[in-house]
Regions:
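NTP-handling and nucleic-acid-processing catalytic cores
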Residues: 16, 20, 32-232, 236
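Generic structural signal for well-ordered, non-membrane alpha-helical segments
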Residues: 3, 7, 35-38, 245
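Aromatic/His-enriched, Gly/Pro-containing loop or helix-boundary segments
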Residues: 1, 29, 231-245
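Structured alpha-helical segments in the cores of large, soluble enzyme domains
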Residues: 2-14, 217
Length: 245
């Protein structure tokens, strides 16, 4: 009834504007004829094997507990918390020894429980930088800025690679250390800020989802419809995601 009320309002408005049309035979997506046609065509497509069930990240309102269309999303400048995180390498990194870490930077710390990969750009230069007893892998270009932000002033470069050299190396999840995740390649990685090593959570972002699909990494989102972490988030279970920041 609500939708049909506004159909009538629109129709009368168009008539007053002098617009011609089949006003008594409107094109309505809620009409039984339209719905039955969609079902029939969908069935034909299904029979070709082109339909499958999967998961992907979408815009979601935790207050309304409903999906949002792109047209409903508005962006505003805001200050977000950011964090540098080191993921301990799970496989040998050429030219290094001891404790080696891939360092990421993110402005969405709450997505870290859903981390499933670290993305690097295949063509960027990366360095292994030793500081004390630890070695950090990050973009050669961004390293000075990142190290300064991390409060590290005494360091040396012990090895260099391209992103392609790092593909398929592994690391241990920072929250779930028994989980081993891969280093993958992604053209979405930039040198605008951060470390050139990008925290990748396919269940929380479109670019992460796309690059994850290329590597067969299924999206994972330990968050319920109210924006609260589920038991899959470990010690963060029960917290609203933004408060977890």
């Amino acid at each position: 009834a609500f939708a049909l009320k506004y159909v009538d309002n629109h129709r009368e408005g168009f008539k007053r504007l002098g617009i011609t049309g089949e006003w008594e035979n409107p094109y309505l997506t809620l009409s039984p004829q339209y719905v039955s046609t969609i079902i029939r065509v969908f069935a034909e497509i299904y029979q070709t094997g082109a339909i499958y069930r999967g998961l992907k990240p979408i815009y979601w309102c935790p207050n309304c507990e409903t999906a949002l269309a792109e047209a409903e999303v508005e962006y505003a400048d805001k200050t977000s918390p950011s964090i540098y995180v080191k993921f301990k390498a799970g496989s040998p990194v050429p030219g290094t020894s001891g404790d080696v870490y891939f360092v990421i930077w993110t402005t969405t710390p709450w997505t870290l429980p859903a981390n499933l990969a670290v993305s690097v750009h295949p063509d960027f230069d990366y360095s292994a930088i030793k500081a004390g007893n630890e070695t950090y892998i990050m973009s050669s270009f961004l390293a000075p800025t990142a190290l300064e932000a991390m409060g590290i002033t005494d360091y040396e470069t012990v090895a260099k690679f391209t992103g392609k050299d790092l593909e398929n190396l592994t690391y241990r999840h920072v929250i779930f250390p028994d989980k081993v995740c891969p280093v993958i390649l992604g053209d979405h990685v930039t040198l605008d800020a951060g470390t050139g090593c990008v925290h990748t959570a396919p269940g929380h972002g479109h670019e992460d989802y796309v690059v994850g699909m290329k590597y067969g990494i299924a999206p994972f989102s330990p968050v319920n419809k109210s924006g609260v972490f589920t038991n899959e988030a470990g010690s963060y279970a029960g917290q609203f995601v933004f408060k977890a920041n």
